[in-house]
């Protein structure tokens, strides 16, 4: 009988001290084994699960993906789609949409699920807001998502840079709706400073992902705090009741149904309007393994459960990600705007956008699987 392949699963947090490790140089990326090897987590072996048939994505033909990548490189911009190895990158890029990642490509955290590189970040690029705004205007985007790495090295966690980007986009593309997907701004006084700064120029949608159930935080999000994230969402909503708030969780990391439902209740109790629920996929063999693949029927049941709690929109499915069809999610939640447009094309209608989503979903079981964080 063939022995099952085994991988490691985090068990508990250990010391952050790594006396044998050389100091990190600013801007140097640590990825895969180098990144997880410095993580304050111990491991135990578990079998590797085979991907089920529903973990599939559509890979469109044509050169739209390369065209968009070229435009991003031309403007020295980064997308989380590329840095986090998102499985939906081909579909989104082929439609001319992307989630821009500001404040560099190096994160100060070492989350065991995430494929973004760890290290000591460089100082924020003061030209980035202008470059981002110019690209958004050139692409004719009507909806844009802006996210960032964690910047625990900055007193405001990067909040001022977010505001600079929002202001620049509104100057160059006043019709564009802006969703920001922020880090947790954890640290003494950092949340207060960040919220004060964001109050000067709030986004159209505020998104912060809790990522997983609280019991798994020590293994999945070392350095983060579940209640802190909930408080950030609630405080922002209290300051800006007219701005929709949003959060997301991944499944397959060892959580139970009861824990997921409790997390959804917590989010709603903290005045979160929209929620995304999707399957975690291991980006490399060095990251947290997948412990379970939730079925499409289970995702559908969670969508119904969430809507019954009072969320204005619940996107729940194996390939759902926080920024995937974010414009559609916001529209369903009542935020009025024209649909996102493709690179160099006229605006698509809401009906056409919905049809594209339906076609992609129907094609999912026939196409190649791409790993994701």
Curated annotation (Swiss-Prot):
SMART domains: Elp3 (SM00729). Residues 12-36, 346-373 are annotated as: Disordered. InterPro entries: Aldolase_TIM, Elp3/MiaA/NifB-like_rSAM, LIAS_N, Lipoyl_synth, rSAM. The keyword S-adenosyl-L-methionine applies. Gene3D superfamilies: Aldolase class I. [4Fe-4S] cluster 2 binds at residues 107, 111, 114. Pathway: Protein modification; protein lipoylation via endogenous pathway; protein N(6)-(lipoyl)lysine from octanoyl-[acyl-carrier-protein]: step 2/2. Its main location: cytoplasm. Signal peptide: none annotated. Binds 2 [4Fe-4S] clusters per subunit. One cluster is coordinated with 3 cysteines and an exchangeable S-adenosyl-L-methionine. One of its GO terms (molecular function) is lipoate synthase activity. Residues 93-312 form the Radical SAM core domain. NCBIfam families: lipA (TIGR00510), PRK05481.1 (NF004019), PRK12928.1 (NF009544). This is Lipoyl synthase. It comes from Xylella fastidiosa (strain M12). The lineage of its organism: Bacteria, Pseudomonadati, Pseudomonadota, Gammaproteobacteria, Lysobacterales.
